Regions:
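Alpha-helical bundle segments that constitute or directly flank the non-heme di-iron/ferroxidase center
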Residues: 1-32, 93-117
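Alpha-helical scaffold segments that form or flank carboxylate-/histidine-based iron centers
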Residues: 3-14, 34-53, 92-96, 121-135
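A structural signal for well-ordered alpha-helices, especially hydrophobic packing surfaces
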Residues: 19, 26, 52, 56-59, ...
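Alpha-helix boundary/capping detector
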Residues: 34, 41, 67, 74, ...
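Conserved alpha-helical segments that form or flank metal/cofactor-binding pockets of metalloenzymes
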Residues: 38-73, 140-143, 147
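Carboxylate-rich helix-loop segments that flank metal/cofactor sites and access channels
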Residues: 57-107
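Preference for long, well-ordered alpha-helical segments
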Residues: 95, 99-147
Length: 147
């Protein structure tokens, strides 16, 4: 595999994982009657869906067709996050902390991918999404701080 395809695969997988994680966190917050926070996380999950669609278009423009399913490593990470979430007692703070950690990881991956040897079209999409991901990360930090 070449570097461009590897980058596309990693980005699309982390976006899929983010969608699943944020959706699950929103569901759990709804169950605890934290509907405003849940709504924010649902909006961020929708953002991930839009980012994934954009990356798919970029991939097709560049002649790539990355797979849609998450990796084993990502599935293990989600499993660990689920265990960690359960150990937190399903508290709103625990759920938001796990979401914040997921956002931190996503931003870190995007920052790394932006420095790779990739076509400028892909780099531009990464940089644009990274700015919004940083904002999303700050939003979740603010939700935690307001608790």
């Amino acid at each position: 595999m070449n570097n461009t395809n590897d980058v596309l695969i990693q980005l699309m997988q982390i976006l899929e994982d983010g969608t699943a994680g944020l959706t699950d966190a929103a569901r759990r917050l709804d169950e605890l009657s934290y509907t405003a926070q849940a709504g924010t996380l649902r909006e961020l999950a929708q953002q991930r869906i839009a980012f994934h669609a954009e990356m798919k278009i970029v991939a097709e423009e560049l002649g790539y067709n990355p797979p849609e399913a998450g990796t084993i490593v990502a599935k293990l990470h989600r499993g660990w996050m689920s265990i960690k979430d359960r150990l937190s007692g399903e508290s709103p703070d625990g759920i938001l902390e796990v979401a914040e950690q997921g956002e931190h990881h996503t931003v870190s991956v995007y920052e790394k991918m932006a420095t790779q040897d990739i076509p400028e079209r892909l780099r531009a999409a990464i940089v644009a999404q990274l700015a919004e991901l940083r904002s999303a990360h700050e939003t979740i930090k603010a939700l935690l701080a307001s608790r």
